[in-house]
UniProtKB/Swiss-Prot annotation:
The active site is at H116 (proton donor/acceptor), K142 (schiff-base intermediate with substrate). The keyword Oxidoreductase does not apply. The gene is aroD. Homodimer. This is 3-dehydroquinate dehydratase. Belongs to the type-I 3-dehydroquinase family. Its EC number is 4.2.1.10. GO terms for molecular function: 3-dehydroquinate dehydratase activity. It comes from Aquifex aeolicus (strain VF5). GO terms for biological process: 3,4-dihydroxybenzoate biosynthetic process; amino acid biosynthetic process; aromatic amino acid family biosynthetic process; chorismate biosynthetic process. It is an enzyme of class 4 (lyase). HAMAP family: AroD. Pathway: Metabolic intermediate biosynthesis; chorismate biosynthesis; chorismate from D-erythrose 4-phosphate and phosphoenolpyruvate: step 3/7. InterPro entries: 3-dehydroquinate_DH_AS, Aldolase_TIM, DHquinase_I, Type-I_3-dehydroquinase.
Length: 219
């Protein structure tokens, strides 16, 4: 299980240093939260993360799934996906999916295909369909959904376990905190933690997750 820390560009160098010192494996660049989204600026941040020996997830979240509008979004994806270890694109952004799959495959990088629901955990058939669609497009499916009960958490993890392959599973909110650690047992390969601020409900602080990973998984 790899630990990712989402960062915007506020105090970027300082927070990057903290992320490395506290044990993060990956920095997720939340470009939709950047103050400057010009190509050269974002590229510099990507290169800065790599210079510290950490992997990167390039994320430019769409407004429909909790992000902000970035007018040069497609350009950034096309130019920077070959440089990032992972690129995160929403399943709903179908116009970009095939293009990004081809770009990342040619560059030897990985594509995360994400689905978000900030209100509830959807029915079982939707969970299965999202996973299968993610694999069909050649990526690692990521499901991040709001848990309104512990039953929601158990359902997401157990249903997802029935579909083979790498995946990322997140139950958001207080009920779902356990999924950020236990998801590994059910095939989840990356967990997201907070550094200075949480980018999603229920994120566990980085230092705490590093210790929990050592304690439970000896990783």
């Amino acid at each position: 299980m790899l630990i990712a820390v989402p960062l915007d560009d506020t105090n970027f160098s300082e927070n990057l240093k903290k992320a490395k010192e506290k044990g993060a494996d990956i920095v997720e660049l939340r470009v939709d939260q950047f103050s400057d989204t010009s190509l050269n600026y974002v590229k510099e941040k990507l290169e800065e993360v790599h210079s510290q020996g950490l992997k990167t997830i390039l994320t430019i979240r769409s407004p429909e799934e909790g992000g902000r509008e970035v007018k040069n979004r497609e350009e950034l994806f096309e130019e920077l996906s070959p440089l990032s270890d992972y690129t995160d694109i929403e399943l709903s952004s179908r116009g970009l999916l095939v293009k990004l799959y081809n770009i990342t495959k040619e560059a030897g990088k990985k594509l995360i295909i994400s689905y978000h629901n900030f209100e509830l955990t959807p029915p079982n058939w939707i969970i299965r369909e999202v996973l299968r669609e993610g694999y069909r497009y050649g990526g690692i499916p990521k499901i991040a959904v709001k848990a309104n009960s512990y039953e929601d958490v158990a359902r997401l993890l157990c249903i997802s376990r029935q579909v083979e392959g790498e995946k990322i599973l997140i139950s958001m909110g207080d009920y779902g905190k356990i999924s950020r650690l236990a998801g590994y047992v059910f095939g989840s390969v990356i967990t997201y933690c907070s550094l200075e601020k949480a980018f999603a409900p229920g994120q566990i602080p980085l230092e705490e997750m590093v210790e929990l990973r050592k304690k439970f998984y000896r990783l």
